[in-house]
């Protein structure tokens, strides 16, 4: 698969008048209707860090591995190609040598973030973390909130240098989710996963990885042997499918609160399927090799999201105990 970069214009304020309903503000309130999910701009997370337009410090991959939505992509002379179908975990810690120095943002949210995509991400982050705060509290635990960093093209993390080509990802070392908003254009145009709830699924999946860290699941997988981190039944695949299931738990919560419209769940299922290992491999090479999977097939990713949506419990998302994925 050739994964070309999109032209990246800076996102700013939306035009005053729009012909479609995406991001349209209700004239009487701050509630927005985006041809799907109902969301409120008065309920946005303060844990969003806008680093778009900044030049990251150079660094090599180090620390705990990133956990992302897509297999790792690297650029060669003839375009973007999949060279390794794995993201993160211990054996990548010294892949390129050296450590990483985390760059701490000096502001929580910048004024430049006053655009519809950023507002929507901030709302979804707030809602997902409020949901997990309640779930943890119900079991006597305290949920520790993650930060979400908006960046352009590349960024520096405690896990090393991050790049937009890898798609959205979560860094366990700094407990931050990283998103280049242009990925949503790729998700819609290249992968065919359109709609605002497809975009919301991306955030919910990455927050699912943050939940895994707090439950101690990430550490157990990180210590798994190298041979257990690739393949259709691997710990890597089970970790990713569980994050999909956790995203489904959040989706169930939004449905119970009447935030969803008809077709929203289908959008999320479509997004989960679009980034299945089998589908990406087939696009890249015309062949499917389950032995190199790290995220699960399209059908598995959709199935586990739906399982979380249908059951709404952490116990239902135990992919590690499942005999069949």
Report each predicted region and the residues it spans.
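Long amphipathic alpha-helical segments used for membrane anchoring, targeting, substrate engagement
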Residues: 32-109
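A metal-dependent hydrolase signature that marks the N-terminal structural subdomain at the beginning
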Residues: 38-40, 83, 90-160
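Short helix/loop segments within enzyme catalytic domains
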Residues: 115-143, 233-234, 238-281
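Active-site recognition of the HExxH zinc-binding catalytic motif
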Residues: 132, 198-214, 244, 248
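Catalytic zinc-binding patch centered on the HExxH motif and its immediate surroundings
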Residues: 153-180
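Short pre-active-site segment immediately N-terminal to the catalytic Zn-binding motif
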Residues: 183-201, 231-235
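Catalytic Zn2+-binding segment of zinc metalloproteases
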Residues: 207-222, 252-255
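Pan-zinc metallopeptidase signature
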Residues: 275-325
